[in-house]
């Protein structure tokens, strides 16, 4: 996994140590993490909307905000990830992607579309920047669809991981 898809490792580690769903893991921002208190605030989820052909930022499955505690291992993983992201931002320079959401109103409903733009692209006025935790080296978000593909690949290639799904990581957290 480390050689084939390194960006998939962080979300898998977060899900393993904190018991998050795939969309919640991808929707986690640095503002949701308190490293001092060792807790995460889970308040959003990312999902793909096949009708709109867009990734949508929305509420969690139960539409409730919750706090999840974690230990020293995940604390160290997150500190290392933050350091790596800052290094990548410097290396990629203006080609580093920034992540944004746009509020959309349709028939008395509000939802948020996800976008990512390189530093060279002009940012529309209605885009708001968001600081996700699970990023690819170029700064773009590691999406649930990619993680599902990685897990499917692992289940086919590794003995003992047949029928492995990302959701099973939720059951490792107690």
Language-model features, listed with the residues they occupy:
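Active-site/binding-pocket entry motifs
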Residues: 46-48, 75-76, 84, 140
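DNA breakage-rejoining catalytic core of tyrosine-based enzymes
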Residues: 1-2, 37, 43, 49-71
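Mixed-charge, low-complexity intrinsically disordered segments
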Residues: 48-55, 93-121
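Phosphate-binding active sites in nucleotide-utilizing proteins
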Residues: 32
């Amino acid at each position: 996994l480390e050689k084939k898809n390194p960006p998939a490792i962080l979300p898998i580690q977060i899900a393993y140590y904190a018991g998050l769903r795939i969309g919640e893991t991808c929707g986690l921002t640095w503002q949701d993490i308190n490293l001092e208190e060792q807790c995460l605030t889970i308040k959003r989820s990312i999902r793909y909307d096949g009708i709109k052909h867009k990734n949508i930022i929305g509420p969690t499955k139960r539409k409730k905000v919750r706090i999840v505690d974690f230990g020293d291992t995940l604390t160290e993983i997150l500190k290392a990830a933050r350091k790596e992201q800052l290094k990548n931002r410097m290396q990629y320079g203006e080609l580093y992607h920034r992540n944004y959401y746009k509020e959309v109103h349709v028939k008395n409903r509000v939802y948020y579309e996800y976008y990512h733009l390189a530093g060279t692209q002009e940012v529309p006025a209605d885009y708001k920047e968001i600081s996700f935790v699970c990023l690819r080296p170029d700064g773009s978000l590691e999406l649930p669809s990619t993680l599902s593909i990685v897990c499917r690949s692992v289940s086919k290639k590794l003995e003992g991981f047949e029928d492995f799904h990302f959701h099973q990581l939720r059951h490792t957290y107690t």
